[in-house]
Amino acid sequence: MTLPRFDQIRPKIEQHIREVKDFPKKGINFRDIMPLFTNPQLVNELCVVIADHVRHTVGHVDSVAGLEARGFLFGPQVAIQLGVPFVPIRKKGKLPGATIEASYVKEYGEDRVEIQEGAIKNGDIVFLIDDLLATGGTLRAATDLVVKAGGKVGEAFVLIELAPLNGRSKLPDVNLTTLISYDSA
């Protein structure tokens, strides 16, 4: 069986993304991926396609790391498809035990993300996954976190990229794949 490629699954995914104007505040057009989860077969198909993409473009990966919270919706299933561990990247203070952390700048200050110490081993190749790339701060911090833990980002994948916010510019050293890119934020 030939697995569908990104260009074949993209229109199906786009049909399940809802634009919500002025959310969470006026002037923001929120891209809501939650309607996608009303179709479990499509979510499964997407995760199979992502895993197939990883096998053919990155090759070997040691783990899949997903960013809190919506990276957790796809990351574990992609990791299962690849037969590798899933590493949750969480906001500071959400993981027990010793952690490694990295910071990033938000609109009104600094925030931190972390992983549990030992979740990524020295030399591990990691596939990063999240739902959205906007300004790039969170994905930059996640990349820095993987490197700080001794790993290397084999590729980063986002479901949606808001191109006008130029988040890609913060990731010049990252092989980044986007399923859907919007020309308006």
UniProtKB/Swiss-Prot annotation:
GO molecular function: adenine binding; adenine phosphoribosyltransferase activity; AMP binding
Keyword hit for Repeat: no
The UniProt record lists the keyword Hydrolase: no
Pathway the protein contributes to: Purine metabolism; AMP biosynthesis via salvage pathway; AMP from adenine: step 1/1
Gene Ontology process terms (BP): adenine salvage; AMP salvage; purine ribonucleoside salvage
Family of the protein in this entry: Belongs to the purine/pyrimidine phosphoribosyltransferase family.
Protein name: Adenine phosphoribosyltransferase
Gene, per the UniProt record: aprt-1
